[in-house]
Amino acid sequence: MLKRSHRALLFIIFSFIFSSAGAQKFALVDMDYIFKSIPAYERANEQLNQVSKKWQAEVDALQIEAQTLYKNYQNEVVFLSQEQKKARQDAIVGKEQEAAELKKKYFGPQGELFKKRTALMTPIQEEVYTAVKEIAELRGYQLVLDRASDQGIIFGSPKIDISNEVLSKLGYSN
């Protein structure tokens, strides 16, 4: 009798687990594909690349100036008085600090590049995420995975990939 009720209990538990797992609906989306298909996103990326190159050139120029000052100092150190040595060393350190501060200003965690990226990309990303959410709610998906960023996905059926539907909802044809 105990074995029979034990089996029945196990059957009920497994039935519940499998029935609730079967009710889950999943979808995949390829965010890289979506963003590459949106011209505004590509333009924003290009704009960020251009400004990044410009700012990096400014930082590089200051670093080259510091290196030049140092090389000149090394070549002339034997001819300099203590005061001249100190003045040159201070100039070199000052130039290096100026380059480091400029680099931090442009490329630091809260730097100009971060601010510009946020200003350009956030509206586009929010629009895409809103479209994904609307499609998920409409179709009853409990989970939408990004196949571009989740390396845990080994295989995903194209039938559950909603990337093209997201692009269509945003007004872009694929």
Where are these regions (language model features)?
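Amphipathic alpha-helical segments
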Residues: 24-139, 143-151, 173-174
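Short, exposed beta-strand-loop hairpins at the edges of beta-sheets
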Residues: 154-155
